[in-house]
Amino acid sequence: MVGFSGDTIAAIATAIVPQQGSVGIVRLSGAAATEIARQIFQIAGQQPWESHRILYGYIRDPESGRLVDEALLLPMLAPRSYTREDVVELHCHGGLMPVQQTLQLCIRAGARLAEPGEFTLRAFLNGRLDLSQAESIADLISAQSPQAAQAALGSLQGKLGHPIRQLRDRCLDILAEVEARIDFEDDLPPLDLEAIAAQLTAAGADMQAILSTADRGELLRTGLKIAIVGRPNVGKSSLLNAWSRCDRAIVTDLPGRTRDLVESQLIVGGIPVQVLDTAGIRETSDQVEQIGVERSRRAAQSADLVLLTIDASAGWSAEDQTIWEAVSDRPILLVINKRDRLSEAERHAIALPQQEFKAIVWTAAAQQKGIEDLEAAILAAVGTGDLTSANWDWALNQRQVAALTTAQTALRRVEETLQAQLPLDFWTIDLREAIAALGSITGEGIAESMLDLIFSRFCIGK
């Protein structure tokens, strides 16, 4: 896909929801975008065709004259467009037929169906975005919390790319000094080794400061999966309902009513959280319930955090011990539910298990009590605290973390080379590795195969 030949591409830029979408957009980009649009769009009246001016009219099949849709057209001529090429958007009525027929007309008129992420790839190749900005667009589209969106917008505005380019420039400056001494050793004064050591230390510290945000950034981007597990009738479904503030799960006094996983999407301290209410885990002869129990075990094994829920009035039982043993390889937070059934004195007297838990939280889910304590314990367990009050300028992805780690490791080797007083040729090897790794974050010198992989993860039309 990389290295396009200047052809004109087209794609549907909005989600296709059959019979529900109010507006659908077909996007064109390339040298022939305006010509193709003129072939299929009939302007109503005497409206002037100007860049960034919306036109009203009709989409017609140029061969048969058949009316396809009543629409708006927005031309955005180069370089003032998303791709820095001529871009035309056709705003149709939503639903399947109008946008699909309009797209087919564009292709018949000479456009090519865009590949995933090709509009953003062209924006990158034409210099409108660096690679970190391009990746942030996909993050913004998939953001599941306001904080994740804020981080994506910060990166889109260059708040990650700018410090990365500064780090790369500093490494280039050091490399230039070193190579100058290699080529013109007799004509230049010796290197100021103390100054270079200080520069390397400062650059490494700046890299570490960026890397220190990686774990929290990953949580913002991908979120947490939490499984509520426990024996039947301890209040797992009530806990989910209280937490999600709606009746997501059926609650009865009869044990074993939850047979399948019930899922709820929440935001806890700025982190997207997928909560799974599982079937009560116990030995049972009911075949359907057995399936639910097995799904519960699998859900717990795949969760980032397990909420092992017990009944305060029953205390820690042998069944609870068995469940704990089944999930003990996962981080576990103990939730003691139905605290309202015990007096204060009885709560202090209850025999708590000796196992290690991330935290122990008392709740009364039926009365919606203890939820704030539960959320605080979860944030403490994952080591983030509340992220809603922080200003997020970026959220590193795994590729960026790997590149920064490579650069940091290479700079450490340069420091070791300096301390060992090895020849300058050894310096250049590691400096070049650091420069290449930093450049890969913003897209400088990155391999075409890597670009294809990155942009293939985008949706078609973006």
UniProtKB/Swiss-Prot annotation:
Enzyme Commission number(s) of this protein: 3.6.-.-
SUPFAM superfamilies, sorted: P-loop containing nucleoside triphosphate hydrolases, TrmE connector domain
Protein name: tRNA modification GTPase MnmE
Subunit structure: Homodimer. Heterotetramer of two MnmE and two MnmG subunits.
Protein family (similarity comment): Belongs to the TRAFAC class TrmE-Era-EngA-EngB-Septin-like GTPase superfamily. TrmE GTPase family.
Binding site for GTP: 233-238, 252-258, 277-280
Location of the protein in the cell: Cytoplasm
Signal peptide: none
Residues holding Mg(2+): 237, 258
Organism of this sequence: Synechococcus sp. (strain ATCC 27144 / PCC 6301 / SAUG 1402/1)
Gene that this sequence comes from: mnmE
InterPro entries (UniProt xref): G_TrmE, GTP-bd, GTP-bd_TrmE_N, GTPase_MnmE, MnmE_dom2, MnmE_helical, P-loop_NTPase, Small_GTP-bd
GO BP term, example: tRNA methylation
Any one GO CC term of the record: cytosol
